Amino acid sequence: VFADASARERLNAIVHPAVMADFDRWCAGHAEDDYTVFESAILFDAGLDGGFDVTVAVVAPLALRLERTCRRDSASPDEVERRIAAQMSDDELVERADYTLVNINRDDLAADVSELDRRFRISKSERDATD
């Protein structure tokens, strides 16, 4: 489906409503949590970003993405490149997201995620104080 935009749209029209309904049910059981996270490589592409307070882009250099995805999925570089080509560019993703994390190595990413967690918890505390 990555090479066929029409087939991808038909598939997304089936999958995305079910995924969002499942996420809504999951969130109902976590209403007291400080915040919840929804992971999606195609959040903006699918037009799902409107239902979220904050968006976070996670990007990495193309060569590293290719290497990681080929290894993870046992896929060829050509197949992975087709997937990436079917998605929004990193430049547009970063432009649209509220925050951006760069995933080059685990230690730096973990530190950046911890900082983002701290910010989200402070924001939650500030919202609670005004309620």
Put a short name on every predicted segment.
Residues F2, S6, A60, S74, ...:
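Residues in soluble alpha-helical coiled-coils and helical-bundle/repeat scaffolds
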Residues V1-Y35:
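ATP-dependent small-molecule kinase phosphotransfer cores
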Residues A7-R10, E39, V54, R82, ...:
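Residue-level recognition of specific faces of alpha-helices
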Residues A21-G29, Y35-R71:
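ATP-dependent NMP and nucleoside kinases share a basic, alpha-helical "lid"
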Residues P17-R25, G50-G51, R71-E126, D131:
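Small-molecule kinase domains that catalyze NTP-dependent phosphoryl transfer to phosphate-bearing small molecules
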Residues V1, N12, T69-C70, V113:
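Short, flexible helix/strand-to-coil boundary loops that buttress conserved ligand/catalytic motifs
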Residues L11, T55-V56, R65, V80, ...:
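Hydrophobic packing within well-folded, soluble alpha/beta domains
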Residues A3, L43-F44, D108:
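Glycine-/small-residue-rich active-site loops that bind phosphorylated ligands and cofactors
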